[in-house]
Amino acid sequence: MCSIGEDDFGDEGGTHAMLPSCSETGIVLRAGDCSKCGQSSQQLYKLNFRSAECSECFLKYVRHKFRAALGAAKVLPRNAEILLVIDGSSESLVLLDMVHFAQTQNTFKRLHCNARVLYVDAHCSPIKEEESPLLALNELQRRYEPFEFYVIQLNGDPQSLQLLKDYTVRQLDSILDQFNSSTSRQDYMQQKRKFLVGGVAMKLKCSHVFEPSISPSLATQLLTSVALGRGASVALDVALLDDRLMGDVKLLRPLKDLNDQEVQFYVHAKELKAFRVDDPSHYPLSGGSLQSLTRDFVANLQLNYASTVSTVFRTGDKIAPKRNSKEIMASYCALCQSLLDNNISDTLLAIEYSRAVSEVGVELKMKSSCDVLEQRVLERLNEKEELCHACRNIQAELSSGTLI
């Protein structure tokens, strides 16, 4: 452990301790010369650890990070069929714009792939027509021709996929309101969305899926996954390539090296307008969810310590379970597609025993309490064998119905 400054916390309050960064960055609203190309610009962009630059130089820099993520790993074959998932967030619009730009370049610089766009409708309450995502989606389709846009509801199946021009907004009849906690609801929405996207990709014969995750969201995802009991799959949750989708579909995160500042600057430079209406924070009591609290925790640290997000999410590359040849016949979770660990640990036994005590409660009789508890623990461990520990926790928070 680092011990710098440990002995310096006296009356001066830690004079030699690490201090938060306070560098001034942001869009400079004045004319000036770009530090890269030397051209005069009406608006300069100042990123952390970079000199002020014009919009053209800034866009080249950010787009290079996108292309470098795909090129360095060589994970996207030539002329691949890709499914680009958008949710109306700023980062999803940035990804859409980058893919479209990469496909409109000359032959040498062109990204050789065929892209389709998917929007997953997860809003489960009536909304005003002017607040409907269809207006923004239709505008995007006109702007980013010739991409085909598809829409599907979160509670649907891949066969219910519709083209944007044929889609009509209707109230969702889902189980989102049946969860006892907002943490489980958000976790279910995330896993269900990924499961649905994999099915849609198979239907459209797409071999790869582009997900608009950036470094802050991946850092939050890493910490959240560990807290929710998904530690065995946390490396895939934050990696560039996630191969857990059905049908050998590969999920890619080409924006994983971008941060919030770069995304917001890109949105400003390209005059993009976010329209996300299915954010989990719109649901009641979502502010107290584990995901929301973790996101706020990471964001607050990032404000003062610029390397927080990078340090956290890059740790995920080093966290992976041991693999062996027996995994050829391994089974996978029916919802999140993660590898099932059939070895019962003492921790899981203790958790299920505690839940059994809570469920049986005062109905226990002293003479049969041990037998009843042991029987209940065995029943719980054998229930939902097709689900992993984290997804069984989601099922336990569901007041009625089943996840699959």
Curated annotation (Swiss-Prot):
The keyword Cytoplasm applies. Keywords: Cytoplasm, tRNA processing. It is found in: Cytoplasm. One of its GO terms (cellular component) is cytosol. Pathway: tRNA modification; 5-methoxycarbonylmethyl-2-thiouridine-tRNA biosynthesis. Pfam families: CTU2. GO terms for biological process: protein urmylation; tRNA thio-modification; tRNA wobble position uridine thiolation; tRNA wobble uridine modification. Gene3D superfamilies: HUPs. One of its GO terms (molecular function) is tRNA binding. Belongs to the CTU2/NCS2 family. Plays a central role in 2-thiolation of mcm(5)S(2)U at tRNA wobble positions of tRNA(Lys), tRNA(Glu) and tRNA(Gln). May act by forming a heterodimer with NCS6/CTU1 that ligates sulfur from thiocarboxylated URM1 onto the uridine of tRNAs at wobble position. This is Cytoplasmic tRNA 2-thiolation protein 2. It comes from Drosophila mojavensis.
